[in-house]
């Protein structure tokens, strides 16, 4: 073999060339990763039914108030309903406050869902009283809740103190002790309606202590049957007590001394009424249906109905509607009851909720700082653009 050929052989010049590399077919783009949405939390029909029925009783109680002076039966119904309707509502509020942990998100909802509506409705009620009540000098005071707004103040305070009640060893006995002390303390005064805040406190704390199985117990068939004679006994006792008892005890807005009673009676009445209220609340829950009914959806709008019906309830007094003689007959009392139930039902409907959402559930993102995670997420998205 000649030298040039040998040289070419050594350098690989005579090697068989490799086949041309084929372009790999383009890979199909991977489908985008779909992040599953968290499941929508379904509302519990039982509690929505309970809230709706409780708020109907609240409206009926307000409608019966001007009638009880002329009708012992109306007075008995009034006392019976006032024994448990707000306690039931407050127990439910406490039960659904169990997860409150003072995190930024929950504090924001506390401000927008409780504090802001309080300011709006306190001012609105004041102007309504000036106009409809012919009291043009009635002052605006956020420290003196008028009529129904006391509940918003109380709920704000109760919910804000929830983390404290979750760490103390005996929350309910402590809450009862506070309520008893309030009932014998006339110097508490009227600021923020603290008497009601403190005297109704045990029902909120009771709700915090309850678990789902406790509600299952009162919803048994045996409990429903037992609730009937209990309510009948309560009505009979209320009929006997109506002309003998000061109904202001049920409002829990005054101390014993302010009701012209001896101081020791405040402790007795607070503990006795708490026991009676808890029994009737349990009987009320026993009768609440657990399935979805035509009024179940209205349970989401009970706070709307509660605050809005106050204008009609007070207006009926300002405008002397109850001066009509026929309203103080059995037929008139039934008519008032039906009208109160129909009114509160209408005020809990979705159209009314949409109309007044600006006042009850305002969007106020502009008023709050963004938390660190949200801010970092926003900066990261901006950099990727």
Each PLM stretch: what is its role?
Residues 2-385:
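Alpha-helical transmembrane segments and their immediate juxtamembrane cytosolic regions
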């Amino acid at each position: 073999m000649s030298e040039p050929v040998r040289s070419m052989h050594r350098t690989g010049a005579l090697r068989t060339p490799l086949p041309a590399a084929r372009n790999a077919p383009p890979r199909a783009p991977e489908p985008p990763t779909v992040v599953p949405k968290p499941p929508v939390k379904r509302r519990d029909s039982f509690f929505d039914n309970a809230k709706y029925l409780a708020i109907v009783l609240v409206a009926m109680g307000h409608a019966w108030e001007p009638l009880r002076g002329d009708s012992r039966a109306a007075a008995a119904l009034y006392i019976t309903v006032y024994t448990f309707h707000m306690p039931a509502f407050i127990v439910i509020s406490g039960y659904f406050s169990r997860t409150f942990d003072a995190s930024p998100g929950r504090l924001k909802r506390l401000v927008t869902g409780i504090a802001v509506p309080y300011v709006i409705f306190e001012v609105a009620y004041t102007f309504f009283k000036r106009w409809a009540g012919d009291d043009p000098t009635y002052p605006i005071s956020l420290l003196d809740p008028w009529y129904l707004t006391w509940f918003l103040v109380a709920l704000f305070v109760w919910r804000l103190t929830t983390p404290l009640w979750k760490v103390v060893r005996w929350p309910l006995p402590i809450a009862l002790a506070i309520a008893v002390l309030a009932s014998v303390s006339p110097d508490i005064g009227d600021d923020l309606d603290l008497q009601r805040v403190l005297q109704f406190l045990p029902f909120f704390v009771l709700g915090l202590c309850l678990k789902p199985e406790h509600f299952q117990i009162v919803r048994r068939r045996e409990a429903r049957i037992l609730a009937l004679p209990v309510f009948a006994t309560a009505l009979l006792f209320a009929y006997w007590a109506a002309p003998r008892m000061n109904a202001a005890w049920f409002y829990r807005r005054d101390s014993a001394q302010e009701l012209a009673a001896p101081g020791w009676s405040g402790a007795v009445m607070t503990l006795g009424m708490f026991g009676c209220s808890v029994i009737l609340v349990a009987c009320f829950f026993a009768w609440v249906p657990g399935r979805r009914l035509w009024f179940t959806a209205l349970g989401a709008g009970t706070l709307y109905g509660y605050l809005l019906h106050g204008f009609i309830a007070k207006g009926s007094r300002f405008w002397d509607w109850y001066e009509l003689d026929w309203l103080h007959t059995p037929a008139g009392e039934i008519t008032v009851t039906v009208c109160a139930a129909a009114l509160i039902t209408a005020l809990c409907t979705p159209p009314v909720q949409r109309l007044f959402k600006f006042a009850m559930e305002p969007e106020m993102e502009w008023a709050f700082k963004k938390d660190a995670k949200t801010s970092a997420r926003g900066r990261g998205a901006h950099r990727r653009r």
